[in-house]
Amino acid sequence: MGAGRGTVLVAGSVAVLLAAVVASLAVGAHQLSPAEVAASLWTEITGTGSTYADDVVASRIPRTVLGLMAGAALAVAGVVMQGLTRNPLADPGILGINAGAAAAVVTGMAFFGAGATGANVWIALPGALVTVLLVYGLASGRRGSTPVRLVLAGTVVTAVLMSYIQAIALTRPDVFNLYRFWAVGSLSGRTMEQAWDILPFFLVGLAASLAAGRFLNALALGEEAAASLGVRPGTAKIAGALAATLLCASATAAVGPIGFVGLAVPHMVRSFTGPDNRWLLVLSAVTGPALLLFADVAGRLLARPGEVLTGVITALLGAPLLILAVRRMRAVA
């Protein structure tokens, strides 16, 4: 894809993202106009005065910020996972990242008094990292890990961890009551403290992932071809997996295991960019937050004055896209 077309796509995606941000700040039990949102943001920045609209916007800022971060993290992690496994149906959970984070959170709830939010960031991240290392250890052989081995190892580890989660949740009603709200995934009830907690991991993972576009393009040609181009396949795969783990684990820790964003966004963007992972990563980083914020807004509109959890909306949006992707792959084959 040419630079001119890419620039136009990025500009259009940024415009859509800005619209999603305004909608996220304006829509809810109390509706605000874009002008009220702008005035309230200015008041929030300058610290001058306070009105009811200002308080409403201030209460929606944390969920909007976390929507931006989680959407970008999940979408970019999805691109990296699809590139590493050379599987267009892969998502960030294919290496057991979501299951590892969830198992760690359930353990914290059951044995260390963790709640549904807050300190889960520091519990979920180690759980996800340990799970990825375990998956790579199981998938590695004399010739290193292959995409098929990674997928199989990730599937096995995920199944074991989900069995552990179900065993704890079914035998501990108190844990189940906490876990069921976190497990669906939602942006509601979040605070800026959680955004600050995941910010370092998010920035490191995002920077490393955006820099991996060239390596992912090389790996798409096969490991031997990638090696002939000066890329070390083993090192590239480990670095990419760690970057995706930081992104997915930080997002999962903050907002829960929201599904389908990491699968749906790369597919939507790829239809415009083609297979070039460099543009795919950049555009996914912008489109992912827009999709997640619009899903959150839709959840607020569908059940006012209450709301439908964001994870439910993304599943409703992502499932048809997954079916279309599978049918498209069969048609191409």
What are these regions (language model features)?
Residues 1-333:
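Alpha-helical transmembrane segments in inner-membrane proteins
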